Amino acid sequence: MDFTRDDNSSDERENDVDANTNNRHEKKGYHRHTNEQIHRLETYFKECPHPDEFQRRLLGEELNLKPKQIKFWFQNKRTQAKSHNEKADNAALRAENIKIRRENESMEDALNNVVCPPCGGRGPGREDQLRHLQKLRAQNAYLKDEYERVSNYLKQYGGHSMHNVEATPYLHGPSNHASTSKNRPALYGTSSNRLPEPSSIFRGPYTRGNMNTTAPPQPRKPLEMQNFQPLSQLEKIAMLEAAEKAVSEVLSLIQMDDTMWKKSSIDDRLVIDPGLYEKYFTKTNTNGRPESSKDVVVVQMDAGNLIDIFLTAEKWARLFPTIVNEAKTIHVLDSVDHRGKTFSRVIYEQLHILSPLVPPREFMILRTCQQIEDNVWMIADVSCHLPNIEFDLSFPICTKRPSGVLIQALPHGFSKVTWIEHVVVNDNRVRPHKLYRDLLYGGFGYGARRWTVTLERTCERLIFSTSVPALPNNDNPGVVQTIRGRNSVMHLGERMLRNFAWMMKMVNKLDFSPQSETNNSGIRIGVRINNEAGQPPGLIVCAGSSLSLPLPPVQVYDFLKNLEVRHQWDVLCHGNPATEAARFVTGSNPRNTVSFLEPSIRDINTKLMILQDSFKDALGGMVAYAPMDLNTACAAISGDIDPTTIPILPSGFMISRDGRPSEGEAEGGSYTLLTVAFQILVSGPSYSPDTNLEVSATTVNTLISSTVQRIKAMLKCE
């Protein structure tokens, strides 16, 4: 019996051991997910790497897995991804470390083997360099002491200033090719090139009353006359590195749609989140107000042609005539080889828009084009510094952070353009006028939207101007009977718009301040001498005034284009109605036209025609016009002469939304900023140095004032 009981106990223990062993094997068993489950889990992980309990339960029901299995899979996946990223980062850091180490070795070799350029021997040693540096510091301290001693002596004995600043300003003229203008400042003295001082030009009540005759600062030398030193090898390397960083940053900004960009609280446009930007990118300038914007447009132009225009300063200025006032390529960092993948330029550009009240912006930018993939190119801009460069302003008011465009080639000659503008503006130095403050602060001034709207319009104009084999049906050719005549008129209109937009800067201006109105800027008068083809040679007085109207821009634009009422405000009509002699559409919008107008003047001696070019876009519009005698108009209409030789002196109107948010977004807002500008030829090339411009100033002041009052009365905005 005892042996039987022992045997039974032994059997039970063996059974228990076998059961425990089986349970242990069952606990250690692995469950492999199916390929469908893994694919679904990985897809979900890309969208949400940290699902909550509810999401895990739903996903488990979908895949027939327990929530705990889902939880453990996501934990393992996150650990695996983190490990993979760390390995990739370590590999990149090791490669960068090796690269830097090799660069240091090459620099050390170069320093050890440096030679003296004059004699070809070994360069100075470390001790010689320190001795020379101490000598320079001692000389610098001595010169500072001498400067202080002489300055104190002059102050004590009433001496004059140590530097002489020329008071007479240079006077500019517009250029047919933005960066090659020869109509540059000339000092006018006792010779035929001397212009009287402002105090002798404007006498009488203007200097004592409501006219500001403070002489502006002396402008810079023309770019073609400035001495640009060749870039050293180190400067080229530094610029190429900056260009690479700019391309990378702009590409990241475009790809980070949801995280980096947010909607503006003012007008729902996309702006960069400053907090995230400081987190992801290195700040280059924090002393100012950042402006950022992004816009996308599809234009009818081949991507290759767009890239060529962006990299050629003269073509760039012609493509954006109402924004780019001047542009010039300063340095080419590599050869223009479109089969290559990357090429860079150093470009000077001056931007100006809408009104003399809007301060221009000057940049020295590094522009880089890089092919990202097939049919996709990135063009990035970033501010760069060159020594001994003269600007119109004695101090820059803007710095361009990495900005640019992504160009994607589309079928049938179209291109998709994604535009990013990111600048830092120092408003403390040049504060914009209150009329345009909302426009500039809201981003509608120099923002991406203005660039894309202008790009779309000018691309359409190029198509309508150059790719038309015969007179289109939507044109009203009238007196123009040939396609050559049409092309001549279109070219004249384009040049007139460009010259009118250039004139708006009015660097050398004198102000008539407003007497009482709060929505008027007063009248600004500028004087310049023109010596180049395309405009009448001689002394020209230009004047402009800006005002706010409680009407949408489209209504103001249609009013200025209305021929039935034009004779009531246009002095060129002499009170007689005008008819349309010819009209050509310049874009998909039938309101954008270039036309010849003919006032019904009976006297054949005073009979003339008016060339008018006008456009309207999402941000405003422009109406520019110039009078022509019948012989000149007939020559332009025939197309038998070069249109660039026909002199044009345009006047007109700049129309803009005011930048304030409104419900009438489709019509450009409920308020309009209108700038009226006229030009008068005072005398021909042989003007007298004693010319008194008081009569001309009075005439143009009266002309501007009366035109503004008539327009306001007709629009019932008094």
UniProtKB/Swiss-Prot annotation:
Residues 232-464 form the START domain. GO terms for cellular component: nucleus. It comes from the Eukaryota. GO terms for molecular function: DNA-binding transcription factor activity; lipid binding; sequence-specific DNA binding. InterPro entries: GLABRA2/ANL2/PDF2/ATML1-like (IPR042160), HD (IPR001356), Homeodomain-like_sf (IPR009057), START-like_dom_sf (IPR023393), START_lipid-bd_dom (IPR002913). CDD domains: homeodomain, START_ArGLABRA2_like. Residues 1-12 have a biased composition (Basic and acidic residues). Signal peptide: none annotated. Probable transcription factor that binds to the DNA sequence 5'-GCATTAAATGCGCA-3'. This is Homeobox-leucine zipper protein HDG9. It comes from Arabidopsis thaliana (Mouse-ear cress).
